[in-house]
Amino acid sequence: MIALIQRVLNASVTVEGQTVGNIGPGLLVLLGVEQDDNEQKAVRLCERVLGYRIFGDENDKMNLNVQQAGGSLLVVSQFTLVADTQKGMRPSFSRGAVPQEADRLYQYFVGQCRERGIETQTGEFAADMKVALVNDGPVTFWLQV
């Protein structure tokens, strides 16, 4: 399971012209689910995302996690993160989980984040989404479990 996390001043996701998720300061989490992923990996990745210290403290050092910084999450499914790009000129998505299982684990990940007390907005699984964001930094990390 992969999370590409971006520290943002704000972010939103729109489906068919309607805003379905919107946050102020926090993290945009692009989430990719692989074939061998499971609930344990979702829990571990949730813990890493929430615990990752990438927000500035009083000395502007990256010492605070998203919850300590008072931020929120916007979680958006993105199957292209699991693409194999090693060969050729077209990505292969053979490592990705089947859609039904990917959706289940995506929802499970979101639920785990919410259970830990952080405001969590979402996109819409498998929809054609428009994601808008204002990067803060920019600060972007690839987390994989």
From Swiss-Prot:
Keyword RNA-binding: yes
A single GO cellular-component term on record: cytoplasm
Keywords from the UniProt entry: Cytoplasm, Hydrolase, RNA-binding, tRNA-binding
Compartments where found: Cytoplasm
Chief location bin: cytoplasm
GO MF annotation terms: D-tyrosyl-tRNA(Tyr) deacylase activity; Gly-tRNA(Ala) deacylase activity; Ser(Gly)-tRNA(Ala) hydrolase activity; tRNA binding
Database matches in Pfam families: Tyr_Deacylase
SUPFAM superfamilies named among the record's database cross-references: DTD-like
Transmembrane segments: none
Top-level taxon: Bacteria
A biological process from GO: D-amino acid catabolic process
The protein's Enzyme Commission number: 3.1.1.96
Gly-cisPro motif, important for rejection of L-amino acids (motif): residue ranges: 137-138
CDD domains: Dtyr_deacylase
Catalytic activity: glycyl-tRNA(Ala) + H2O = tRNA(Ala) + glycine + H(+); a D-aminoacyl-tRNA + H2O = a tRNA + a D-alpha-amino acid + H(+)
InterPro entries named in the record: Daa-tRNA_deacyls_DTD, DTD-like_sf
Known role: An aminoacyl-tRNA editing enzyme that deacylates mischarged D-aminoacyl-tRNAs. Also deacylates mischarged glycyl-tRNA(Ala), protecting cells against glycine mischarging by AlaRS. Acts via tRNA-based rather than protein-based catalysis; rejects L-amino acids rather than detecting D-amino acids in the active site. By recycling D-aminoacyl-tRNA to D-amino acids and free tRNA molecules, this enzyme counteracts the toxicity associated with the formation of D-aminoacyl-tRNA entities in vivo and helps enforce protein L-homochirality.
Entry remark concerning the domains of this protein: A Gly-cisPro motif from one monomer fits into the active site of the other monomer to allow specific chiral rejection of L-amino acids.
UniProt similarity note: Belongs to the DTD family.
Subunit-level organization: Homodimer.
Protein name in the entry: D-aminoacyl-tRNA deacylase
Gene source species: Serratia proteamaculans (strain 568)
Phylogenetic classification of the source organism: Bacteria, Pseudomonadati, Pseudomonadota, Gammaproteobacteria, Enterobacterales
